[in-house]
């Protein structure tokens, strides 16, 4: 039986992860290892300045106290889940992870850590906070497809699901990441002692929403599947940079 490590960034008790785990447990061996609280936008942060503790809930779920999503997958794969899991599934996130969101997302980061540790990995997000059952069934369907036809590309699958009933889903689309306009909102408040408090504002509005993007697919009622990879090298820029370096070295004056 496939052994799945399930994590997220919304916290171990979040509706998304609990709905997902309930659906997956009907077919697979599932172990939740997730933050004990909301750690949204934690990205790939790893805790190295203090020790971490675990809490095991009555149902067997494991919460990592003050841990990040990356901490949870690191500990789960390397120590807590035995035998070692076959795959990491992160989600269901409460809200989308489209376009530039993947840079900040703790949901995507948990999947990235799984892939970095050598496992297949899926991140699942719902474009809203209502139809978690839809996203759970979509995840089960994708896992079934992966078992029938294993994917050898070695990528992370970033899945975004429209927040609609399952019967209204039009199908799947393979997409690229779109983009948002840069977020510039900062909200300020003053505490009782007169100190200024700062709140980071919401993400920017959609920018690149071309027909092959994740934004376009979800807006049209399709499940978006975007392949992501751990290697951040900009390969197309390598030759350009080599030429630049050669010219810069020739023309340098000091």
Swiss-Prot record:
For this protein, what does the record note about how its cofactor is bound?
Binds 1 divalent metal cation per subunit.
Molecular function terms in GO for this entry? 3'-nucleotidase activity; 5'-nucleotidase activity; exopolyphosphatase activity; metal ion binding; nucleotide binding
> Which EC number(s) does UniProt give?
3.1.3.5, 3.1.3.6, 3.6.1.11
InterPro entries named in the record: SurE, SurE-like_Pase/nucleotidase, SurE-like_sf
What parts of the sequence cross the membrane? none
Q: Where a divalent metal cation is bound, by residue?
A: 9-10, 40, 93
Q: What is its main location?
A: cytoplasm
**According to its UniProt record, which cofactors does this protein need?**
a divalent metal cation
- Disulfide-linked positions: none
Q: What class of enzyme is it?
A: hydrolase
Q: Where found, per UniProt?
A: Cytoplasm
Claim: Acetylation is one of the keywords in the record: no
Specify the superkingdom: Bacteria
Question: Pfam families from the entry?
Answer: SurE
Q: What is this protein called?
A: 5'/3'-nucleotidase SurE
């Amino acid at each position: 039986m496939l052994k799945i490590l399930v994590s997220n960034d919304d916290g171990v008790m979040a509706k998304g992860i609990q709905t997902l785990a309930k659906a997956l447990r009907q077919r697979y061996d599932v172990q939740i290892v997730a933050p004990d609280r909301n750690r949204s936008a934690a990205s790939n942060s790893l805790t190295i300045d203090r020790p971490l503790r675990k809490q095991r809930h009555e149902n067997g779920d494991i919460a990592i106290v003050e841990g990040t999503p990356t901490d949870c997958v690191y500990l789960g794969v390397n120590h807590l889940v035995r035998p070692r899991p076959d795959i990491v599934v992160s989600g269901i996130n409460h809200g989308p992870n489209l376009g530039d969101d993947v840079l900040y997302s703790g949901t995507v980061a948990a999947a990235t850590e799984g892939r970095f540790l050598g496992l297949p990995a899926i991140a699942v997000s719902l474009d809203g906070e209502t139809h978690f059952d839809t996203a759970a069934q979509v995840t089960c369907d994708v896992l079934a497809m992966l078992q029938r036809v294993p994917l050898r590309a070695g990528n992370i699958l970033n899945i975004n699901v429209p927040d609609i009933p399952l019967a209204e889903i039009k199908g799947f689309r393979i997409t690229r990441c779109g983009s948002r306009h840069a977020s510039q909102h900062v909200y300020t408040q003053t505490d009782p002692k007169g100190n200024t408090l700062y709140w980071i504002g919401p993400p920017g509005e959609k920018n690149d929403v071309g027909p092959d993007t994740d934004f376009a697919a979800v807006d049209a009622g399709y499940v978006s599947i975007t392949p992501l990879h751990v290697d951040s090298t900009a390969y197309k820029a390598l030759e350009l940079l080599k030429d630049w370096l050669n010219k810069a070295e020739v023309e340098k004056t000091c």
